[in-house]
Amino acid sequence: MFEKPVVKTFQYGNHTVTLETGVIARQATAAVMVTMDDTAVFVSVVGKKEAVPGQDFFPLTVNYQERTYAAGKIPGGFFKREGRPSEGETLTARLIDRPIRPLFPEGFNNEVQVIATVVSVNPDVQPDIPTMIGTSAALAISGIPFNGPIGAARVGHIDGQLVLNPSNTELNASRLDLVVAGTESAVLMVESEADNLTEEEMLSAVVFGHDQQQAVIKAINEFAAEVATPSWNWVAPEANTALNEKVADLAEAKLVEAYKITEKMARYDRIHEIAAEVNAVILAEDPEADAKEIHTIFHDLEKTVVRRSIIAGNPRIDGREKDMVRALDVRTGVLPRTHGSSLFTRGETQALVTATLGTQRDAQIIDELTGEKKDYFLLHYNFPPYCVGETGFVGSPKRREIGHGKLAKRGIAAVMPSIDEFPYTVRVVSEITESNGSSSMASVCGTSLALMDAGVPIKASVAGIAMGLVKEGDDFVVLSDILGDEDHLGDMDFKVAGTSTGITALQMDIKIEGITKEIMQIALNQAQGARKHILSVMDQAISGARDDISEFAPRIHTMKISADKIKDVIGKGGAVIRALTEETGTTIEIEDDGTIKIAATEGAAAKEAIRRIQEITAEVEVGVIYTGKVARLADFGAFVTILPGKDGLVHISQIADKRVEKVSDYLTEGQEVQVKVLEIDRQGRVRLSMKEAVEKPVEAEAPAAEEE
C-alpha cells in the first residue's frame, strides 16, 4: 500500500535523530516524523499553489500542538480534550516561525501552513528542538520556494563548559538556556535566558550552537536529495519599473524631509499626507493603476530613504547618533494602593508596571507533557491599541503579547529570590501606555523598579535595551535603543537584558544573511554601554528593595508544629482550618513537614491565628492548672475541655472536698472551671481535679529565656 518510506538517521550530540516521510499524511504538501530519543513530533506543511490576487503580504501560519497522549495522560477538565494553545505552545510556535519566515523569497505571497504535533515525549528531551528540525526538513522536501534548510540547537552552560542540547535534568544545573537557529552560513534567531553571563560567554554560546547545528543541516540536505521533490515553478513577480520611478519622482524628496520630523505622530501624519498625494496623482493619470501596488512601492521607498540616510552617517529619525539612548524618566510608587509600581519612560515608549504579592497558594500550576510544576513568578505584558494611537479589539492576549511577556520574564528571572528566601508568589503586569520601539525592554526596566518598590529582595537592578542594524553590502551601522520604524525598516532586532555585571536574557531576530560574529560582538558591546547608562538612571530613583513590603500586601508569618499535629490543625474534613481562616480573616498553608505559613494584611489577625494554632497543638502538662469548659456531665463525673480538641475527666470524687452525691448540683455544661491535671495514662486519657486546683494552685512555668 505504501511506497518505501525515506528514513534518515543521524547523531546529534548525545542524541539520535530520525527523519521519516512517505507513510503518514501523504496528501499534505510535505510531512515528516522526527524522533529524538523517544520524543517524536509530526510536522506537516501545506502550501497553496496560487496566491490570492492582489495580496501584498506572505500569509505564513505556524501551529504547534502538544497532545497529552504523548505523555500517556488524559486531559483534565470537563471535556477531556485539548483546547486552545497553552502559553508554552504559543511560545514554541513563535520559536519555529521566527527563523523560517525570512527564508521565503521576496514576493512569494502564497499561503503556507505548518502544523507540528507532539505525539510522543521523553520527559528529558524537550520537543522544541526536534520540532524546529522537523519543520526545516518538511519545508526542504516540500518543493515550496524556501532558502533553507535551517538547523536548531539548545546550548547550556554547566561547570564552565558549553553543552549541546542539555537534558531537562542538566538544565537545572545550567547557567544558560539558549536556543539558536540558522542556515549553513548565518545565524537567524536566538532566544535565551542566562544567569549573568558575560558578553563573551553569550557570543561563544551562539557561535557554538551554530557550529554544532551544521550536522542537522547536512542531514536535512541529504534527506531532501533522497526524497527528490521537484521544486515549484514559481517566478518572482517582475518589478514595475515605470511605477517605481514615478513614485520616487513624486515622493522621495518629500520623504527625506518627512523623516527629519522627530515626533512620531507628526511624522506619521506627514507621511500619510505624502502617500495620499502620490496616490491621487498616479490614479488621476492612470485610473487602472493598482492602489495596493502603489502602497507597496511607497513603503519600499520609505525603507530605502531611511536606510540610505543611516548608512551615510546622518542623524537618525529622531535626531540621535547611532549609540545614543533616548531621554529617560523613571518613577516609582506611582499607584497608591498597589504593592509596588513604577512608570518607566524612554522617549516615546512608556510602561506602567505593577507588582502584586500573594501567597504560595496563588502560584500558577503548569501542567506540561514533561510533568507538573509551580510558577511563583508571573509576568504579564499588555499592549492596548491606544499605546500607538489606534483603535482596536481588546481581549485575550495575542501571540506577540505572550512572547514579549516571556522575554521580559526571562530578563528578570535570574535576579528573583527563591521561594525559600521570599515566600510569596509575585505577579507583575506591564501595561504599555506608549510605544515607539522596544516596549518589551521597557517592561524589563519597569519590572525591576516595581519589584524593588514592592520590597521584593531582587539580587540586582535589571535593564533592557533593543539594538538594530542597517547593512548595505559591506557597510553596516549598529543602532542603540531602536525606534519602531528602525525595527521595521532595519535588518535585525537584537534585545539584551541584564545587570551591571552580566546578561540575563538575549533575543535576536535577523532578517538577512551575512550577520558576522564581528557585527554581533559590536552589538553586544554597544548594548552593554547603553544598559549601564539606563541602570545608572534607574538607580537614582531606587537602587535596592525597600526595607519593608507595602502595608496593603499580605504579611507571611511562619511557625512550625510537629508533623503529627497537622491532622489536629486541619480537623475532620478540613473543619478546623476552615473555621480558623474564616474567623481570623487569614490565609493558612500547611506543608508536610509541619511548617505553617499564615498570610494576613493585619498583624492582629495573624497573631490571633497563631495563638489558636498554638492552643490546638499544645500538649497537656501534668501538674498545670487550666481554665476549661464543662463539655458534658456523666453520673461518675464531668468531661472538661482544657485545650481545643482535648478533654479530660473530673471524677465525681475530685469535684469538691466534701462528698458529692450528684454532679449536676455542682456543674453545668458550658461552665468555666479551674482544673489541675493529675495524670495522663498510656492511652492519652487525662485525669483532672477541681479540688486540687483550689487547694494547691500551680501555675505553668514560663519558658526559660534563650541566651543570645
UniProtKB/Swiss-Prot annotation:
One of its GO terms (biological process) is RNA processing. Its EC number is 2.7.7.8. The keyword RNA-binding applies. Residues 623-691 form the S1 motif domain. Its cofactor is Mg(2+). Keywords: Cytoplasm, Magnesium, Metal-binding, Nucleotidyltransferase, RNA-binding, Transferase. Involved in mRNA degradation. Catalyzes the phosphorolysis of single-stranded polyribonucleotides processively in the 3'- to 5'-direction. Component of the RNA degradosome, which is a multiprotein complex involved in RNA processing and mRNA degradation. It holds the Pfam family RNase_PH_C. PANTHER family: POLYRIBONUCLEOTIDE NUCLEOTIDYLTRANSFERASE, POLYRIBONUCLEOTIDE NUCLEOTIDYLTRANSFERASE 1, MITOCHONDRIAL. This is Polyribonucleotide nucleotidyltransferase. It is found in: Cytoplasm. Belongs to the polyribonucleotide nucleotidyltransferase family. GO terms for cellular component: cytosol. Residues 554-613 form the KH domain. It comes from Vibrio vulnificus (strain YJ016). Mg(2+) binds at residues 487, 493. Its main location: cytoplasm. It is an enzyme of class 2 (transferase). Coiled coil: none annotated.
